[in-house]
Amino acid sequence: MPQRFSRVLIPQPRSRFVRLRCPDCGNEQVTFSHAAMVVRCLVCGRVLAQPTGGKAIFAGHVVKVLE
């Protein structure tokens, strides 16, 4: 087979897990980048991620994008 046909392109997902830091209490927690429900801080209850039908809007600081 020619060189160009030997590669198989595998699509990669665009969604990731992210580690968010709460701006009020500094708690860090992991959430999904395309969250379908409101994500609240487990310590103080502040909204960290608001769903939009696609990628969530993050109110907290994104510390790390997990692979």
Swiss-Prot record:
A GO molecular function assigned to this protein is:
zinc ion binding
Superkingdom of this protein's organism: Archaea
Q: Where does each C4-type zinc finger lie?
A: 22-44
Cofactors required: Zn(2+)
Keywords of the record:
Metal-binding, Ribonucleoprotein, Ribosomal protein, Zinc, Zinc-finger
Q: Which GO terms describe its cellular component?
A: ribonucleoprotein complex; ribosome
According to the record, cofactor stoichiometry and binding are noted as: Binds 1 zinc ion per subunit.
Binding locations of Zn(2+): C22, C25, C41, C44
> GO annotations under biological process?
translation
Which ranges form a coiled coil?
none
Q: Which family does it belong to?
A: Belongs to the eukaryotic ribosomal protein eS27 family.
Q: How does it assemble?
A: Part of the 30S ribosomal subunit.
Q: Report the protein name in the record.
A: Small ribosomal subunit protein eS27
